[in-house]
């Protein structure tokens, strides 16, 4: 079995066209290797604007992790540590973030295009394998859409703090509570590269997203530096906002044709949706309405946790994810 696994990894490397000499050295990968319990490696798939940077640890069935905004691959470090002993954990920098490519056109961030890019990424990293897909925030919305589009490629789906993309648009169209929660979206969409730089918006965004977690010791000072560095580039912030500009129409203009994939049915694979009780990003009806999108849905609420469900209470989050993965006691054997 080990020989088969090594052959699969070699094939994935060949398909991805990896070059160790060409790979950048990510400070977050260096840090992960200093403090983590497993070796972490990085690589790239594709070139130019289509390049995807990924970080890998562990062996076993493949789990692909996709972060949201504003973030980068390291938001999944606690999950990679928890399950790297029995799963092949691969976290990607989403398009526009971290060391991945950064297309200049808003249209390049449409969910349909991102899903096709994710499909190529999965095919390169885990050829012939049905994977577990995990997403948070925009990465979660993308993961939902991918599962609706290509359910045959996935073994199961786990989502942290995110609705299906089509459901999010439905909620914006008909739920006043969701419109109120998303009132920030038009202001965010109005920002451009010039205003982002003039307003020093990356610094404000970092403090809003991660300042409290650092002050309370949820993230270490070093981890705070890594997130600050990852978010400091105005171009990266502009690319993150492009996800909003490309995929969220004016609320009153949302129609049945706005979502993707079109006419998506209810998926049948096992799905886990984890929310935080203090997260104000989505209306309280999210979990109930998500049941119309997934026949085999498990929902969980992390008490006292806000939007950053992967790391605010990693022990609770990992227990839920581990049980969902079918691990005895919710953890890797021997851990």
Where in this protein do the model-derived segments appear?
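Mature N-terminal segment immediately following signal peptide/propeptide cleavage
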Residues: 43-49, 53-57
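Bacterial N-terminal signal peptides that target proteins for export
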Residues: 1-11
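Catalytic histidine-centered segment of alpha/beta-hydrolase-like enzymes
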Residues: 305-314, 318
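Flexible "cap/lid" subdomain of the alpha/beta-hydrolase fold that forms the substrate-access gate
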Residues: 25-40, 50-52, 62, 86, ...
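Bacterial N-terminal signal peptides
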Residues: 9-19
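Active-site helix-initiating loop/hinge in glycosyltransferases
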Residues: 68, 110, 312-313
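Active-site pre-Tyr helix/loop in NAD(P)-dependent dehydrogenases
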Residues: 69, 163, 308
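Conserved HGGG/HGGXW glycine-rich cap/lid loop of the alpha/beta-hydrolase fold
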Residues: 56-99
